[in-house]
């Protein structure tokens, strides 16, 4: 479908599956509308994809000078949006379909790295982040569920999503959700002019920010960084499925704009799927009718 729409842009409609983000909110939670749309990201899988991404940016800007990108390790978790008014946290919501999400404020209040108040904050501020469970906590939860005869979570991301959407606050409190923050709904109310500076601002104001980030200048530097992060990946305390590459200049974000579902100034560079060996120990034959 993406290929057809690329060849025939006149066929693209707002309700096309390629233009939608995430899924509909669950009925068991109140729905909150995001003041600024929470977008998805287009994907890259190799250096050629990154070179095409950079070429697309240069065409859009008609620019041949140096460009900087901020590469941020991409945690495999659940996207959230925090809304502050006059420096006070009013609500927290999941991404949902990008326009509306589920109100999960109460379930997030116990997570460290989410300040309830911010000093010297703009009148309104949206802060975007990723909620996740560590590998160790995921194993602990599944062991507990196995002992209780309950179905196991398939992976830490599913466990984090299930925990965040729990209606029983006692269960949420027992599971050690964590979060990292990586952006805002609009940067114009802040003085920072780079993505790197924005993350420093978030860190200085009490938001937990992933230290695994680095400024890079071209596809070769991106590939070298990705190779290093691939090697470090098994040692991480959480699941990571790649890196997010963003144009470092925030004013250029505005100039580049976005499609209906993804920004043109950022891309997710995915790690190859993890591989593991397994041993087939037995086969039980059954005859069907």
Residue ranges with predicted function:
Residues 1-119, 139, 158, 164, ...:
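Phosphate/adenylate-binding "loop-and-lid" substructures adjacent to NTP/NAD/dNTP-binding pockets
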Residues 64-68, 122-124, 174, 233, ...:
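Short secondary-structure junction motifs
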Residues 39, 69, 90, 125-127, ...:
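A broad, low-specificity signal marking well-ordered, structured residues that form hydrophobic/aromatic
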Residues 64-66, 74-76, 124, 229, ...:
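Short solvent-exposed loop/turn micro-motifs enriched in small/polar/acidic residues
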Residues 110-126, 203, 208:
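Flexible helix-coil linker/hinge segments at domain or subdomain boundaries
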């Amino acid at each position: 479908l993406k290929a057809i729409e690329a060849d025939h842009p006149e066929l693209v409609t707002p309700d096309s599956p390629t233009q939608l983000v995430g899924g509909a909110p669950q009925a068991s939670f109140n729905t909150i509308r995001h003041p600024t749309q929470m977008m998805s990201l287009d994907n890259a899988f190799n250096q050629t994809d990154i070179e095409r991404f950079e070429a697309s940016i240069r065409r859009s800007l008609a620019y041949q000078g140096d460009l900087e990108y901020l590469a941020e390790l991409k945690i495999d978790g659940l996207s959230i949006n925090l809304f502050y008014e006059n420096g006070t946290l009013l609500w927290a919501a999941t991404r949902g379909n990008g326009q509306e999400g589920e109100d999960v404020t109460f379930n997030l209040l116990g997570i460290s790295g989410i300040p309830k108040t911010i000093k010297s904050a703009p009148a309104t501020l949206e802060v975007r982040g990723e909620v996740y469970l560590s590998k160790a906590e995921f194993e602990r939860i599944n062991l507990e569920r196995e002992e209780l005869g309950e179905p196991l979570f398939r992976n830490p991301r599913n466990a984090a999503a299930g925990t965040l959407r729990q209606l029983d606050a006692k269960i949420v409190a027992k599971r050690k959700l964590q979060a990292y923050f990586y952006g805002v709904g609009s940067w114009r109310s802040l003085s920072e002019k780079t993505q790197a500076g924005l993350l420093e601002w978030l860190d200085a104001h009490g938001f937990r920010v992933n230290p695994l980030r680095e400024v890079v200048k071209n596809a070769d530097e991106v590939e070298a960084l990705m190779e290093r992060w691939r090697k470090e990946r098994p040692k991480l305390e959480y699941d990571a499925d790649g890196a997010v590459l963003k144009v470092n200049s925030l004013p250029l974000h505005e100039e580049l704009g976005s499609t209906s579902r993804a920004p043109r100034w950022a891309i997710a560079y995915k790690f190859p799927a993890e591989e593991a060996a397994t041993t087939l120990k037995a086969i039980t034959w059954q005859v069907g009718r």
